[in-house]
Regions:
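Acidic/His-rich, divalent-metal-binding segments that scaffold phosphate/diphosphate chemistry
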Residues: 1-63
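Conserved active-site and cofactor/substrate-binding residues in soluble primary-metabolism enzymes
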Residues: 6, 10, 26-30, 66, ...
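Predominant activation on well-ordered alpha-helical scaffold segments within soluble catalytic domains
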Residues: 12, 16, 32-36, 69-72, ...
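Active-site oxyanion-binding pockets that recognize sulfate/phosphate
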Residues: 17-21, 102-105, 165
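C-terminal binding/interaction regions
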Residues: 19, 138, 144-191
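Divalent metal-dependent catalytic cores for phosphoryl transfer on phosphate-bearing substrates
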Residues: 42-149, 158
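Flexible, glycine/charged-enriched surface loops at secondary-structure junctions
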Residues: 45-48, 188-192
């Protein structure tokens, strides 16, 4: 018997059960927004991509040393489909898992997870504190300064671009567009 695809409400409840950090919740919402945008752009299942984006860091706050492994256990216990579990685990490829992203969904999650952090940090240093007026060239300018958002592993983003066969500028633009759709929820609407 195949597990039923989880509804967004189920993912949201699970996320909030394991996370109290406002910044982690906002990160999950940002990744969900970008995943939904990318699914629409590529004619994929927006609900599935969004739910996977929302739940991808489920275990990070409580179990940072077991990131992805603990999420696998939790999702299995909750009867999530294997496809969803594999996608979530694959975003930690080369960091905390050896599950390589294979599908477009998995490659996208892998590529944009770190990138959302760079976009947020870039937006927050701008006068508007918003993604609504943010352009890819501003993010690329900050990209070059390795001290800026030093916690963002740019090599993961570059590997993700290679996996997807897209240029960095295109991925940045798509990430910004997806984040604009959830700008209110992630606190980056600003005054723009």
């Amino acid at each position: 018997m195949t597990a039923q695809p989880p509804a967004r409400e189920d993912a949201w409840a699970l996320l909030n059960e394991y996370n109290q950090s406002e910044s982690l919740i906002k990160h999950a919402l940002a990744v969900e927004g970008v995943m939904r945008y990318m699914a629409r752009k590529h004619g994929e299942d927006e609900e599935k991509w969004g739910v996977i984006g929302l739940i991808h860091d489920l275990d990070y706050e409580r179990f940072p040393d077991r990131h992805c492994q603990k999420t696998e256990e939790i999702l299995r216990e909750n009867g999530w489909p294997e496809e969803y579990i594999r996608a979530v685990i694959s975003h930690g490829y080369g960091i905390c898992t050896e599950v390589e992203p294979k599908t477009d969904l998995e490659k996208t999650l892998y590529a944009i997870d770190e990138l959302t952090g760079l976009v947020v940090t870039t937006a927050l240093v701008r006068p508007s504190k918003s993604v609504m007026d943010l352009k890819a060239k501003s993010v690329k300018k900050k990209w070059k300064d390795k001290r800026f958002a030093a916690g963002v592993d740019r090599s993961i983003i570059e590997n993700g671009c290679q996996m997807l066969g897209v240029e960095l500028s295109e991925l940045i633009t798509d990430t910004i567009m997806g984040m604009r759709e959830v700008a209110d929820e992630i606190g980056l609407k600003g005054e723009a």
